[in-house]
Design a protein with these regions (language model features):
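Flexible "arm" and connector segments at domain edges
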Residues: 1-89
Length: 89
């Protein structure tokens, strides 16, 4: 995710004063809820789906992930690379 996109997410959240609701637990729950909505896109068929709806739900998941990263003071590249290194062992 680009720095501009990350800043846009932060501004969107700040403008709405949503940070007060963004505890790590609430954000983790929101990620799961949005992931379930993404899964619904494929509920009745593995081959037929609405790509626009998939993009929207995937974006929702990613926005909540970025919010959780911010709340925990983490960097996506850093933790993904750490996990990839662990997985390569």
């Amino acid at each position: 995710m680009t720095k501009d996109t990350i800043e846009r997410i932060r501004k969107f959240t700040e403008d709405r004063e949503w940070d007060q609701f963004h505890s790590p637990a609430n954000l983790a729950k929101s990620i799961v809820i949005e992931a379930a909505e993404l899964l619904e896109c494929f509920q009745w068929s593995d081959e037929e789906y609405d790509l626009q709806h998939v993009k929207e739900e995937l974006a929702d998941v990613m926005v909540y992930c970025q919010n959780l990263l911010d709340k925990l003071g983490l960097d996506a590249d850093e933790i993904i690379n750490m996990k990839m290194t662990q997985n390569e062992v």
